[in-house]
């Protein structure tokens, strides 16, 4: 016992193996950007004029298929927010009308997906007419690529109990992957290619919009008005993003943390990408900036616990942060004083912003989520450094916090008009929508972390916990986690619609859904991490902020 005590005591003074993070790829790329206000105003006026024509098109669409196809195109092009009232009006018309018995697979699936994505209750029984007596989709459907794609996209808004939609995923993926697409229109080919990588419902909305604009302009059946509007709109937003990013970069550079805390990541641009993913629409400037700052706090904390602090230092930092008192800073090592000041100062600015925006009630909650996150990071560090393997259930409970979902949501509350104190009370109850979206990110991160960290054999990951508890191989555990991702998405889909019963607005529900979407795009299909490894996020940064759209 005495020997064990000495070992544990010594272990608490050991620093974790330090990962040398790649430097920022962007340094001063955006900090000196200057927006031409006159040109931006001209774009705004052009958008308004084109919107009037597009609105007329939408309201003139009379048949359900015309309405659904146009709404789908507007959403794919990143334009639907301009017509929110009109789109919801049309969606309600589509929902109120009985489904046309003559709807083919394409139309049936499109209607089903759009209604669910707009939080309407619609039964998956609408697909019964396409299955045989054994409950299998009819093989005659396999030659209808457009219908298969529509069903594939619709199947990804399913719930756990909807077995027909899981069958639809398997059926459509099998046939789409094996389809001869050479004779299909370019638009269909490109949609299929992207969908097999990232189903539309799970895709990064504004990144997809940028991609779809480039596909749409090559389509012979394109609408020139919508194409022009989408290009001017994207150019307008791209310049707005670059302006915000320049302001954020200058703020970040004043702290000079990349030299003061060399163990920490310098990822201001990557953090801002997440902000754009949460809400890309122009009116959500505070959400984008606020989330980026929240993520930078999280990143500094994560790297401090995971990449540098000893167990004793981490425990002390957790205690000091819990007191939230500058007078306590003298108890900390010098490098931790810098971290502590960065957190407190950023939160003080948040508190002032919240007061100006009529959201003073948000500040105490934001502080509490930061403290909560510190405790969860500290627990995770103990498990790893002391090589303890918690039960999978204990891991999941702690991971709901280290997913950072609560801190990230709290960081943007001042920029969300619909959030009230009642919203915060709802989130504090840890609703399924919040916990499930958080776990999507956690599961994908754990899969990638295991592939990265186990290469060096130094760090324990969540897959190690699962392998030991259930006697699985690494491959089996990774497969199990990917299965957990799929099932958790089904919970998100169900709760996204159910929030309409909790008096939780669409703005809030979309925020949580978009967190899961960004995680899916950032972590899946790779062993990289779009925040840890700048090369993973590079394509999104270039598409959103660097590449100019060609008119």
From Swiss-Prot:
<dbReference type="InterPro" id="IPR008930">
    <property type="entry name" value="Terpenoid_cyclase/PrenylTrfase"/>
</dbReference>
<feature type="binding site">
    <location>
        <position position="302"/>
    </location>
    <ligand>
        <name>Mg(2+) 1</name>
    </ligand>
</feature>
<dbReference type="InterPro" id="IPR008949">
    <property type="entry name" value="Isoprenoid_synthase_dom_sf"/>
</dbReference>
<keyword id="KW-0460">Magnesium</keyword>
<dbReference type="InterPro" id="IPR050148">
    <property type="entry name" value="Terpene_synthase-like"/>
</dbReference>
<keyword id="KW-0456">Lyase</keyword>
<dbReference type="GO" id="GO:0016102">
    <property type="term" value="P:diterpenoid biosynthetic process"/>
</dbReference>
<comment type="similarity">
    <text>Belongs to the terpene synthase family.</text>
</comment>
<keyword id="KW-0464">Manganese</keyword>
<feature type="binding site">
    <location>
        <position position="306"/>
    </location>
    <ligand>
        <name>Mg(2+) 2</name>
    </ligand>
</feature>
<dbReference type="GO" id="GO:0005737">
    <property type="term" value="C:cytoplasm"/>
</dbReference>
<dbReference type="GO" id="GO:0000287">
    <property type="term" value="F:magnesium ion binding"/>
</dbReference>
<dbReference type="InterPro" id="IPR034741">
    <property type="entry name" value="Terpene_cyclase-like_1_C"/>
</dbReference>
<dbReference type="InterPro" id="IPR044814">
    <property type="entry name" value="Terpene_cyclase_plant_C1"/>
</dbReference>
<feature type="binding site">
    <location>
        <position position="306"/>
    </location>
    <ligand>
        <name>Mg(2+) 1</name>
    </ligand>
</feature>
<feature type="binding site">
    <location>
        <position position="302"/>
    </location>
    <ligand>
        <name>Mg(2+) 2</name>
    </ligand>
</feature>
<dbReference type="GO" id="GO:0010333">
    <property type="term" value="F:terpene synthase activity"/>
</dbReference>
<dbReference type="InterPro" id="IPR005630">
    <property type="entry name" value="Terpene_synthase_metal-bd"/>
</dbReference>
<keyword id="KW-0611">Plant defense</keyword>
<keyword id="KW-0963">Cytoplasm</keyword>
<comment type="function">
    <text>Involved in the formation of muuroladienes. Produces mainly cis-muurola-3,5-diene and cis-muurola- 4(14),5-diene, but also smaller amounts of gamma-cadinene and alpha-cadinene.</text>
</comment>
<dbReference type="InterPro" id="IPR001906">
    <property type="entry name" value="Terpene_synth_N"/>
</dbReference>
<comment type="pathway">
    <text>Secondary metabolite biosynthesis; terpenoid biosynthesis.</text>
</comment>
<dbReference type="Pfam" id="PF03936">
    <property type="entry name" value="Terpene_synth_C"/>
</dbReference>
<dbReference type="GO" id="GO:0006952">
    <property type="term" value="P:defense response"/>
</dbReference>
<feature type="short sequence motif" description="DDXXD motif">
    <location>
        <begin position="302"/>
        <end position="306"/>
    </location>
</feature>
<dbReference type="Pfam" id="PF01397">
    <property type="entry name" value="Terpene_synth"/>
</dbReference>
<protein>
    <recommendedName>
        <fullName>Cis-muuroladiene synthase</fullName>
        <ecNumber>4.2.3.67</ecNumber>
    </recommendedName>
</protein>
<dbReference type="InterPro" id="IPR036965">
    <property type="entry name" value="Terpene_synth_N_sf"/>
</dbReference>
<feature type="binding site">
    <location>
        <position position="445"/>
    </location>
    <ligand>
        <name>Mg(2+) 3</name>
    </ligand>
</feature>
<feature type="binding site">
    <location>
        <position position="453"/>
    </location>
    <ligand>
        <name>Mg(2+) 3</name>
    </ligand>
</feature>
<keyword id="KW-0479">Metal-binding</keyword>
